[in-house]
C-alpha cells in the first residue's frame, strides 16, 4: 500500500492531501482561510473596542484594551497545547494510523474542557491581583476587573473552539472554523451594539456579547467534528484521556504554550510601562494594537500552515517537501504582512481614529503604528521557522530561544534603555529590536536541525 492509499485520498475523505502534488496552491488554500479566520476574529474583537471607545469613552476603552496582555498571559499555555494536538494528529495521519487519530481527537476534546474550566476559575480569582500588579490606573481598575471576570466565564468555549479547530486543521480543513467565526462574529457585533448603545451596559455588555459569541463558535466547531470526516469524527460519549496521546500532546504543546506565557509576561511588563503614561496612552496603544493583530495573524496563519504541512510530510518521511513548504510559507507570509502593514501606516491617522476620537489617544496610537506595525513582518523569521521545528517534533528549541530573544531582551530593555530614555517612542522600539534578535536565533536553530535531520 503506497503513502497516498495509506493516508486516504483527499477526494474520498474531503481532506487536503498534503503529501502529494504542487505545494503552493495547497499552502495558500490552507493558510488564507486560516488567516481570514483570525483576522475576522480580530475584526469582531476590534468591534468591541470600537463600540466601547466611541460610545463609552477612553476609560472604558482602556479597561477593555488594557486587558489584552492579561488575557493572553492566562490562555496562551493552553492554546499552546492545541499546537501539540495539531502536530500529533498530523503525524498519525502521515503514518496512516487511523485508530491513533481517533483516540487523539477524543483526548484533545477532553483536554479542551478541562483547560477551559481551569482557566475560568483562575481568571476569576486572579483578576484583581493581576490588574493591580500591572499598575492599572485607579479610575480604570473597576471597569477592567468587571470586564475580565465576565470574559473568563467563556473560557471553556474558547478552549473547545481552539482545540476543535486544531483538529480540523490537522486534516487541512481551515474553512469550517472560518464559517463558525463568521456566524459568531456577526452575533457578537449585534449584541455589542444592543448591549452597549441601547442598554448602556458599557464594558459588561461587551464582555457578555463576547461570551455568547464564544459559545456559538464552540458549538459550531463541535457540530462540525461530530458530523464531518469519519477519521476525526467526535463522539462526546467517547471523550477520555489516553495517556500516550496526552504525553505526546504535552511534549509538543507545553513548550509552545510556555513560550506564549513567558512572551505574555514580557508584554504585561510593557503594558505596565504603558500604563505609567496614563489613560490616553493606554487607549491609544490599544487602538494601534488591533492593527498589529491583523498583520500578525497572517504570519501566524503561515506558521500554523508550516506546522501542519511539516508534521504530515515529516511523518511520511518526505523531508524535501518539508523544506519547500517552509520556504513558501516564509516568503508569502512575510510579503502579505509587509503589504498590510504599509497600508495601515500610510493611513495611520484614519485607522487610529476608527477606535477613538480623542486626539491625544490618536497621537499615541500613531507613534505605536510607526515604530511597531511597520516592521511586523520580521516576526515571520522566528514564527515560521519555529513552526517548521515543531512540525518535526522539536518544540522546546524554538520555545527556549524565543524566551531568551524576545522575552528576556524585552525585560532587559525596560530596565536599561527605557530607564535612560523613558519616552513612549523608546518603549515601542523594544518590539522590532527583539524581533531581529529572536529571528536570528530561531532561524539559525532551524537550519542546524534541518541539516541534522537530513543527514540521518
Q: What does each of the following model-derived ranges do?
A:
Residues 61-121, 158-177, 271, 284-348, ...:
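Small-residue-rich hydrophobic transmembrane alpha-helices
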Residues 1-31, 89-154, 187, 198-254, ...:
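Short alpha-helical transmembrane segments in multi-pass integral membrane proteins
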Residues 52-72, 138-143, 203-204, 245-252, ...:
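Interfacial/gating helices of multi-pass transporter permease domains
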Residues 82, 151-169, 177-185, 206-221, ...:
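Short runs within selected transmembrane alpha-helices of multi-pass transporters and secretion channels
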Residues 29-48, 150, 184, 213-217, ...:
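Transmembrane helical elements of multi-pass membrane transporters/channels
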Residues 34, 38, 50, 87, ...:
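Transmembrane alpha-helix boundary and packing residues in multipass membrane permease domains
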Amino acid at each position: 500500500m503506497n503513502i497516498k492509499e495509506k493516508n486516504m485520498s483527499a477526494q474520498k475523505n474531503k481532506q487536503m492531501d498534503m503529501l502529494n502534488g504542487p505545494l503552493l496552491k495547497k499552502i495558500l488554500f490552507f493558510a488564507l482561510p486560516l488567516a481570514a479566520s483570525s483576522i475576522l476574529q480580530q475584526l469582531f474583537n476590534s468591534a468591541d473596542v470600537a463600540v466601547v471607545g466611541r460610545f463609552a469613552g477612553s476609560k472604558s476603552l482602556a479597561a477593555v484594551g488594557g486587558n489584552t496582555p492579561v488575557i493572553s498571559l492566562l490562555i496562551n499555555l493552553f492554546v499552546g497545547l492545541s499546537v501539540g494536538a495539531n502536530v500529533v494528529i498530523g503525524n498519525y495521519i502521515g503514518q496512516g494510523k487511523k485508530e491513533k487519530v481517533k483516540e487523539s481527537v477524543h483526548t484533545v476534546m477532553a483536554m479542551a474542557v478541562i483547560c477551559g474550566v481551569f482557566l475560568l476559575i483562575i481568571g476569576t480569582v486572579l483578576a484583581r491581583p493581576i490588574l493591580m500588579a500591572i499598575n492599572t490606573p485607579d479610575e480604570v481598575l473597576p471597569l477592567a476587573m468587571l470586564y475580565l471576570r465576565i470574559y473568563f466565564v467563556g473560557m471553556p468555549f474558547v478552549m473547545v473552539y481552539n482545540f476543535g479547530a486544531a483538529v480540523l486543521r490537522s486534516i487541512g480543513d481551515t474553512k469550517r472554523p472560518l464559517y463558525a467565526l463568521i456566524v459568531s462574529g456577526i452575533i457578537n457585533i449585534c449584541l455589542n451594539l444592543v448591549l452597549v448603545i441601547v442598554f448602556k451596559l458599557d464594558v459588561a455588555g461587551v464582555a457578555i456579547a463576547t461570551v455568547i459569541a464564544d459559545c456559538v463558535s464552540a458549538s459550531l466547531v463541535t457540530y462540525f467534528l461530530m458530523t464531518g470526516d469519519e477519521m476525526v469524527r467526535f463522539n462526546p460519549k467517547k471523550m477520555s484521556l489516553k495517556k500516550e496521546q496526552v504525553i505526546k500532546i504535552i511534549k509538543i504543546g507545553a513548550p509552545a504554550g510556555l513560550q506564549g506565557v513567558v512572551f505574555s509576561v514580557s508584554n504585561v511588563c510593557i503594558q505596565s510601562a504603558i500604563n505609567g503614561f496614563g489613560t490616553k496612552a493606554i487607549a491609544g496603544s490599544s487602538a494601534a494594537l488591533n492593527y498589529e493583530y491583523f498583520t500578525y495573524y497572517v504570519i501566524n496563519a503561515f506558521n500554523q500552515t508550516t506546522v501542519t504541512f511539516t508534521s504530515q510530510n515529516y511523518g511520511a518521511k518526505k523531508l524535501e517537501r518539508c523544506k519547500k513548504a517552509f520556504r513558501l510559507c516564509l516568503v508569502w507570509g512575510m510579503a502579505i504582512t509587509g503589504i498590510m502593514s504599509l497600508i495601515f501606516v500610510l493611513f495611520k491617522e484614519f485607522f487610529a481614529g476608527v477606535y477613538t476620537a480623542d486626539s491625544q489617544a490618536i497621537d499615541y496610537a500613531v507613534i505605536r503604528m510607526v515604530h511597531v506595525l511597520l516592521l511586523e513582518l520580521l516576526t515571520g523569521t522566528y514564527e515560521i521557522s519555529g513552526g517548521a521545528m515543531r512540525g518535526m517534533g522539536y518544540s522546546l528549541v524554538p520555545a527556549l530561544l524565543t524566551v531568551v530573544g524576545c522575552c528576556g531582551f524585552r525585560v532587559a530593555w525596560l530596565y536599561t534603555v527605557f530607564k535612560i530614555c523613558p519616552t513612549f517612542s523608546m518603549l515601542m522600539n523594544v518590539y522590532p529590536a527583539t524581533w531581529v534578535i529572536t529571528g536570528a536565533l530561531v532561524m539559525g536553530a532551524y537550519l542546524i536541525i534541518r541539516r541534522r535531520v537530513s543527514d540521518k
